[in-house]
Amino acid sequence: MELTVIIPSPSIPEALGVADRPASYEVQAPYPVLYLLHGLGNDHSDWTSYTNVELFAEEQSMAVVMMSAENKFYRKNGNGDDFYTFLSEELPVFIRNMFPVSRRPEDTYIAGLSMGGYGAMIHGLNHPERFAAIGAFSAAIGTEDENEAENLKDGPFDPYGLVRKNIAEEKKVPPIYFACGMQDMLWEKVNDYKDFMVKCGLDVTWVPADGFRHEWRFWNIQIEKFLEWIPRTDAYAKDRQNHRAV
């Protein structure tokens, strides 16, 4: 399994342009952690290749974990691939044992783009008690394949069914940051799902953006905004460079 892990640097903050942080400061406490998921045709390295997520993570004192999921949508597939269990059970244990990250749900977040936005939604909705917020940018919600849609319906990988399940079980769903470019090919399905979530009473921050398609230019903006937006109660919350604006 291929991974990229970003841990804020206590020794050389100026290397990433965070000049106002003392070079000698020590780690105060475990870092809050974001599990950040890539899209179809991408891998664990694309977020760092095409966005400034390293700088944003440093500014926000946030650990970021990125894994490769091939093109398997972060779920369990019939051919034996089980990226769902890896992401939901195995990876968090490994990360907590290897890096100075928090174990508290209040300090744990999940987000992604396109296929990864779908992955963030199904993992966040299957385990709402584990996350303080969910982020989905240009989420690949819905499918044109009728057989696939029928097979997924009301199961653990159906975003609509998971919302209904949480409501029926009276589970509290964490706040959701939901963004999409208005010229994105997925706009209609994303907008429909947003309307469904709002109608169901979920706490949704909706960020439509005119002039953007399914593109890294948009996702670079949104990952910065998401990191500024997320609720924080950790030891670094007051010190982060927060330019909060949505």
Regions found by a protein language model. Name each.
Residues M1-V246:
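Non-catalytic cap/lid and distal C-terminal segments of serine-dependent acyl enzymes
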